[in-house]
Amino acid sequence: MDLDTASHMLTATVRTETVPMARVPWNEPGIIGRVLDAGALAVVIPMVNTADEARQAVESCRYSPVGSRSFGPSLPNNRYGSMYPVRANDEIAVIPMIETREALANLDEIVSVPGVDAVYIGPADLSIALGLPPGMDHEAAVFNDALEAVVAACHRHGVVPGVHANPSIAAKRYEQGFRMITVGYEIFAAQTALRGDGKAARAAIADAI
């Protein structure tokens, strides 16, 4: 979705108990600033491959003196008042994505960057980087060794390991040590609902014949 749509969705959460999280399209300060100004409390940043790129992501999410974020969040101010800059620096979660061989090679450096709260594996991109078909799960040792390496690095540095999954493998990922597990997205949810509705309709018609 585009930034305007994402901003409207984030705005809708401001007076709720929801903790809004946004995945931005790239590690770019202006894009990150827009979703934060709209009310995001966690930002997932794709294709972070080095410690320097992780530091850039953190700085984009933090106000001075620990970052370079520009002040302009009228909506978060409505929720948190004049203390928003202080609370934002303390509470907004910065979540780089691990999706490449380069990121795997730099794991310890990435997760040890101050301000990185979690990392999040994009399994499809990681699969491709490892020479596998895009997917959420593989039997190949190279894929499972990579997952294990991410969990181990996170545990060494007190960072939350995260991964995208689906309902059928969520328990498996939890057993592997992941503690932030997503199990769907809007297109997947719509497809699942439509399949269920179609199945129910066909069953009802069959019963009526």
Report each predicted region and the residues it spans.
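Expand to "…catalyze enediolate/carbanion chemistry for C-C bond making/breaking, isomerization
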Residues: 1-209
